[in-house]
């Protein structure tokens, strides 16, 4: 544990940020899972709607550095391909 006042403050801030980022990361994963679930049901309209809800959230968090930009691009690319492959 830190002894210096500023180090204690930084530890508190770091823990606070960690919890905030964990909840945001969980939210992003949930939106991605909703798209996969819609694809699994075979409903193309629902899958497209879930994708359009997910896309700006993934982009925003990739821009802020919560997830890597390549990971965001990979998710969007894979999901788009799966949605387009649906009948």
From Swiss-Prot:
GO terms for biological process: translation. The keyword RNA-binding applies. Keywords: Ribonucleoprotein, Ribosomal protein, RNA-binding, rRNA-binding. Residues 1-26 are annotated as: Disordered. Pfam families: Ribosomal_S20p (PF01649). GO terms for molecular function: small ribosomal subunit rRNA binding; structural constituent of ribosome. Gene3D superfamilies: Ribosomal protein S20. One of its GO terms (cellular component) is cytosol. Binds directly to 16S ribosomal RNA. NCBIfam families: S20 (TIGR00029). Belongs to the bacterial ribosomal protein bS20 family. This is Small ribosomal subunit protein bS20. It comes from Photorhabdus laumondii subsp. laumondii (strain DSM 15139 / CIP 105565 / TT01).
């Amino acid at each position: 544990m830190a002894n210096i006042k500023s180090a204690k403050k930084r530890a508190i801030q770091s823990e606070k940020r960690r919890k905030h980022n964990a909840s945001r990361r969980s939210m992003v994963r949930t939106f991605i899972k909703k798209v996969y679930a819609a694809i699994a049901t075979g409903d193309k309209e629902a899958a497209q709607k879930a994708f359009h809800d997910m896309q700006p959230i993934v982009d925003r968090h990739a821009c802020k550095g919560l997830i890597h930009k390549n990971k965001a691009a990979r998710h969007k690319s894979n999901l788009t391909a799966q949605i387009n492959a649906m009948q």
